[in-house]
Swiss-Prot record:
This is Putative endoglucanase X. SUPFAM superfamilies: SGNH hydrolase (SSF52266), Type I dockerin domain (SSF63446). The gene is celX. Keywords: Carbohydrate metabolism, Cellulose degradation, Glycosidase, Hydrolase, Polysaccharide degradation. Pfam families: Dockerin_1, Lipase_GDSL_2.
Length: 224
């Protein structure tokens, strides 16, 4: 499996992709691209995406390719998201092993999912995106590897890991007023995300950390 991380437009990536493919000889490629083209030029580069997919299969005809759309921010990216599934389907209909990954289905919260720069994802946002990648790819990857065991959930449950204990925001093994205070300070932006355990702070498992989680934790503490 090859993963190349590089900021750039579709033409910039296309100018390097042949070398990357020949150097790394991947079985699987994850392609998440085109957002920079839209932001830099204001135009949807559908033709560029289509040509890049063809270029990948020309160099590596037997590769398995996953092509993703974008989380719905900024608003302009939605017009690009609208054309990606059709391009992928066209290639699949032509016999290419290409699959669409719908990252736009993220339960998006701009307040928690976007980083300080107002554009890229925060740790919370990337965690959500990683779970969607997992959801759309795991069964196909297992089939490629010849595995048949059931697909596990992308999000751990309290029985999966001793670190998962809802309300234990500071990971001290207890759920008490210290966790409530820390969670409240995070909501008020007194401390940053590195000060809390995101999984344990998301009390209702909706992918967001907000006043609702504060209320749930408060009710739990009052019952205790």
């Amino acid at each position: 499996i090859m993963k190349v991380t590089q900021d750039g437009s579709i033409p910039q990536i296309a100018s390097n992709i042949n070398n990357w493919l020949n150097t790394h000889n991947p079985d699987v490629v994850f392609l998440w691209i085109g957002g920079n083209d839209l932001l830099l030029s204001g135009n949807v580069n559908a033709t560029g995406l289509s040509n890049l997919i063809d270029q990948i299969f020309t160099v590596k005809p037997n590769v398995t390719l996953f092509v993703a759309d974008y989380y719905p921010w900024p608003e302009a990216v939605k017009q690009y998201n609208a054309v990606i599934p059709g391009i992928v389907q066209q290639k699949a209909n032509a016999g290419k092993k290409v699959y669409f990954v719908k990252l736009s289905e993220i339960q998006f919260d701009r307040n928690t999912d976007i980083s300080w720069d107002g554009l890229h994802l925060s740790e919370i946002g990337y965690t959500k995106i990683a779970n969607i990648w997992y959801k759309y790819t795991i069964d196909i990857l297992k089939a490629l590897a010849g595995q048949t065991q059931p697909t596990p959930s992308p999000s751990p449950t309290p029985t999966d890991s001793p670190l998962v204990k809802k309300g234990d925001v500071n990971l001290d093994g207890q759920v008490n007023s210290t966790d409530f205070s820390l969670l409240k300070r995070y909501i008020l932006k007194v401390v940053d995300i590195n000060s809390i355990n995101v999984t344990n702070a998301d009390m209702n498992n909706d992918g967001n950390i907000n006043s609702t989680d504060i209320s749930i934790l408060k009710r739990i503490l009052l019952r205790n």
